[in-house]
């Protein structure tokens, strides 16, 4: 039976923090705090406090979203107990406590802040405006904001999304291939990343893959890192074979909601431009590409060394935006 007390189940605590956010006590801001700054970058669900829960669960906790102001969880910086030596003399102790009785819920560590977060590219741009660590991988949003946010008089962005709110705060609107490459190399050499995720929104004319390809090709050629792409589904499915050939390892399609009525209501732009079925067909098509690649690889076993670059197709949903049974059905379909 699953442990239902968040004090003893860090996985459940992680989910609850996603849903309720975290309030920050003034003690958190004392001089000497280490860790990654809270940045408003173009992560569609918002950007928050990068932290590590017990069990080495890396997470990003909402702290600036409005709902976090009502969170039952508070973050404190406290002295180490006399019977508990600090693991590092310079390391602060952070704990999550429940509002009201101040019951201890969990200790927590801040994700380490890499030295390159304070540097600029050779062009003079802050490296954090080009890319940022999301847990243990690098996230890059190379182009302009999703055009759903730019429509007038009425925007058609997904109703849960914060992309348009974050643009220009901690994220640059224009990033050259060279700037992205410099940040990728810094993150690889100093933060030990092995994966880079490239993300775009919707652009008129389905130009998102055209925009990404120069970045993908250069980063793969120069670093050999694993690369992921998250965009709307392209009408020409053969484009995904081209991505595979240039070294992309993962494609992801965020259809968000399985329930068709809720999809139309919550994601009006995606419904108008693509429709749920097109998202599902792209997931299915790219998954079949992966199965075909595995069969070809297996058929060559025993004939000498072979090169295998993984290929993964993902469909992504957000739990809580539809009835649980619909999300479960989506998970069963995806997996």
Residue ranges and their predicted role:
Residues 205, 226, 230, 234, ...:
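Conserved strand-turn element in the central/C-terminal portion of the radical SAM core barrel
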Residues 60-157, 164-173:
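N-terminal [4Fe-4S]-dependent radical SAM core
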Residues 148-150, 208, 239, 263, ...:
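Short acidic, gly/pro-rich beta-turn/loop elements at beta-sheet edges
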Residues 150, 186-190, 287-290:
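Alpha-helix termini
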Residues 1-81:
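Short Lys/Arg-enriched alpha/beta "domain-start" segment
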Residues 162-182, 187-282, 296, 314:
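Core AdoMet radical
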Residues 212-217, 249-252, 304-310, 322-335:
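Short, electropositive alpha-helical surface patch
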């Amino acid at each position: 039976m699953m442990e239902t007390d968040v004090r003893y189940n860090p996985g459940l605590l992680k989910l609850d923090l996603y849903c309720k956010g975290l309030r920050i006590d003034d003690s958190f801001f004392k001089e000497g705090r280490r860790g990654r700054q809270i940045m408003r970058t173009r992560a569609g669900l918002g950007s928050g406090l990068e932290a590590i829960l017990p069990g080495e669960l890396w997470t990003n906790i909402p702290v600036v979203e409005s709902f976090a102001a009502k969170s039952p969880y508070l973050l404190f910086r406290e002295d180490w107990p006399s019977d508990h030596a600090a693991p590092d003399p310079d390391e602060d102790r952070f704990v999550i406590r429940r509002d009201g009785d101040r019951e201890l819920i969990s200790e927590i560590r801040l994700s380490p802040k890499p030295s390159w977060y304070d540097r600029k590219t050779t062009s003079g741009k802050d490296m954090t405006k080009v890319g940022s660590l999301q847990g243990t991988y690098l996230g890059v949003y190379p182009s302009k904001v999703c055009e759903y946010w730019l429509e007038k008089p009425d925007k058609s962005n997904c109703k849960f999304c914060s992309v348009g709110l974050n643009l220009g705060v901690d994220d640059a609107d224009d990033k050259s291939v060279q700037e992205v490459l410099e940040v990728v190399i810094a993150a690889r050499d100093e933060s030990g990343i092995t994966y880079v995720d490239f993300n775009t929104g919707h652009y008129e004319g389905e130009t998102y893959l055209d925009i990404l390809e120069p970045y993908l090709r250069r980063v793969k050629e120069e670093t050999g890192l694993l690369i992921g792409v998250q965009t709307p589904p392209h009408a020409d499915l053969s484009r995904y074979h081209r991505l595979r050939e240039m070294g992309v390892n993962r494609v992801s399609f965020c259809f968000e909601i399985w329930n068709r009525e809720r999809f139309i209501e919550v994601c009006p732009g995606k419904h108008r431009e693509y429709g749920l079925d097109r998202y599902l067909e792209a997931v299915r098509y790219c998954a079949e590409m992966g199965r075909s690649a595995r069969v070809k690889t297996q058929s060559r076993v025993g004939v000498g060394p072979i090169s295998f670059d993984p290929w993964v197709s993902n469909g992504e949903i957000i739990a809580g935006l539809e009835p649980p049974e619909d999300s479960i059905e989506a998970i069963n379909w995806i997996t």
